[in-house]
């Protein structure tokens, strides 16, 4: 073997081992990074699960008037809620079912709350989506699911036609209240009793 061949062989083996070292070094931070993000997710999960457990205990001991809520099954992040139509409202006598979905980011992100029971309301669309500021931009970690349910009950008593999700119902509410109320009562009787 000549000196040139020997140098080339040494050079290629040292560059090969340096490549392997770089590859190892490159993969190590990725592993650490994924462990960090997994750890962060676990921490969020445990924070959210603890908070949801506490709220479940609170709502079981002291439910908001005309409301109930709790997990659908074993999954603490999936709840079913029942709201009775507020007395004196066009929804009186109705029983409305809602789905509540918490994310691992709860309480830093709002829960997703949707009506499962059809309802004639300018702030609730046909898919059950609710237009309520505290479920969007005005969410605060200080809010609880009990306060959310109370706000929804309040929305059933006093809708917000100035910020509608269903424009035609809002217009009817403002221009022909008697017809609006008749339709809301009819839907309540048909879908919520």
From Swiss-Prot:
UniProt biased composition (Basic and acidic residues): 22-35
Residues where N-acetylserine is found: 2
Biased composition regions of type Polar residues, renumbered to the chain: 36-45
Pathway(s) per entry: Protein modification; protein ubiquitination
Coiled coil ranges: none
Numbered residues of crosslink Glycyl lysine isopeptide (Lys-Gly) (interchain with G-Cter in ISG15): 136
Processing after translation: ISGylation suppresses ubiquitin E2 enzyme activity.
Biased composition (Low complexity): 8-18
Keywords from the named record: Acetylation, ATP-binding, Isopeptide bond, Nucleotide-binding, Nucleus, Transferase, Ubl conjugation, Ubl conjugation pathway
Region (Disordered): 1-45
Domain of life: Eukaryota
Active site annotation, chain numbering: 131 (glycyl thioester intermediate)
InterPro entries: UBQ-conjugat_E2_core (IPR000608), UBQ-conjugating_AS (IPR023313), UBQ-conjugating_enzyme/RWD (IPR016135)
One GO term of the biological process aspect: protein K48-linked ubiquitination
EC numbers, comma separated: 2.3.2.23, 2.3.2.24
Record's GO cellular component terms: nucleus; ubiquitin ligase complex
Domain UBC core: 47-193
Record localization: Nucleus
UniProt main location, coarse: nucleus
PROSITE patterns tied to this protein: UBC_1, UBC_2
Catalysed conversion reaction: S-ubiquitinyl-[E1 ubiquitin-activating enzyme]-L-cysteine + [E2 ubiquitin-conjugating enzyme]-L-cysteine = [E1 ubiquitin-activating enzyme]-L-cysteine + S-ubiquitinyl-[E2 ubiquitin-conjugating enzyme]-L-cysteine; S-ubiquitinyl-[E1 ubiquitin-activating enzyme]-L-cysteine + [acceptor protein]-L-lysine = [E1 ubiquitin-activating enzyme]-L-cysteine + N(6)-monoubiquitinyl-[acceptor protein]-L-lysine
Entry GO MF terms: ATP binding; ISG15 transferase activity; ubiquitin conjugating enzyme activity; ubiquitin-protein transferase activity
Subunit structure: Interacts with RNF14.
Similarity comment text for this entry: Belongs to the ubiquitin-conjugating enzyme family.
Function as written in the Swiss-Prot or TrEMBL entry: Accepts ubiquitin from the E1 complex and catalyzes its covalent attachment to other proteins. Catalyzes the covalent attachment of ISG15 to other proteins. Mediates the selective degradation of short-lived and abnormal proteins. In vitro also catalyzes 'Lys-48'-linked polyubiquitination.
Protein name listed in UniProt: Ubiquitin-conjugating enzyme E2 E1
